[in-house]
């Protein structure tokens, strides 16, 4: 009888331990599942060239960032706004997209440049595009997009796009999310600050002011902006507001100049006094 009681006691203890272990495992699994995926950044790149004819060689280079932790489709579509038709945002999916994009580019140049190919002198054409993560602070992620190309003519062309994404709200940040300042007043500040950051352009007489190369009477307050702890910056590509010789132009607007118009949530997240 005593042996029977002992066996039952041991069996009960083992059953209790197994049950407890199962509960602990379930709690651990639940805790692990509730942890958000760590924010990481990777990249994919394709660089290749093709000899279209004896007179023409074309090169293709493109780099895309990869964000494994980002799952929101609308946010991802906005991040890859220059790359239409992406269905798979994984590293393998983006690599495959770039390979397809490269092949389409080579094919289009071959089909669209038959008249030029018959020319008598050789040239090298190219197209480049790059995504670069500039910063990710206070859940505001700033990505800079650069493209450049040459397909005949006097010189190559290039341009920039700046985009800031609110990772808390899964959306691209708009100017209205930062300031309520009327557009006309903001544009007057841009005109006033046009020479704050020198473009580096010079001629025989020395440095040339940005304002001396303006092609517009009003500098538009566009969505091509980014910011840091001191300023809001507007970035303009060649020909957008100035002559090509001026290059790209960056115009800062200080938080002090925007005082009284800053969005409360933005101001708190950026810790602007």
Language model feature labels by segment:
Residues 2-9:
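Sec-dependent signal peptide recognition
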Residues 15-18:
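C-terminal motif of bacterial Sec signal peptides marking the signal peptidase cleavage site
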Residues 20-273:
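Compositionally biased intrinsically disordered regions enriched in Thr/Gly
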